[in-house]
Amino acid sequence: ERVCCGYPMSCKSRACKPSYCC
């Protein structure tokens, strides 16, 4: 599963903008 780069959350989290995913 991809993560929200720079943030301790998953890319699926509403708080993570798609552009932050890696």
UniProtKB/Swiss-Prot annotation:
GO-annotated cellular components: extracellular region
InterPro entries: Conotoxin_mu-typ
Location of 4-hydroxyproline modifications: P8, P18
Residue numbers carrying Cysteine amide: C22
Molecular functions per Gene Ontology: sodium channel inhibitor activity; toxin activity
Pfam families from the UniProt entry: Mu-conotoxin
Expressed in which tissues: Expressed by the venom duct.
Keywords, in A-Z order: Amidation, Disulfide bond, Hydroxylation, Ion channel impairing toxin, Neurotoxin, Secreted, Toxin, Voltage-gated sodium channel impairing toxin
Cellular compartment(s): Secreted
Disulphides: C4-C16, C5-C21, C11-C22
Role noted for this protein: Mu-conotoxins block voltage-gated sodium channels (Nav). Intraperitoneal injection into fish (1 nmol) provokes weakening and difficulty in swimming after 20 minutes.
Domain notes per entry: The cysteine framework is III (CC-C-C-CC).
Note, other: Authors confirmed the assignment of this toxin to the M superfamily by cDNA sequencing.
Membership in a protein family: Belongs to the conotoxin M superfamily.
Name the record gives this protein: Mu-conotoxin-like pr3b
Organism this protein belongs to: Conus parius
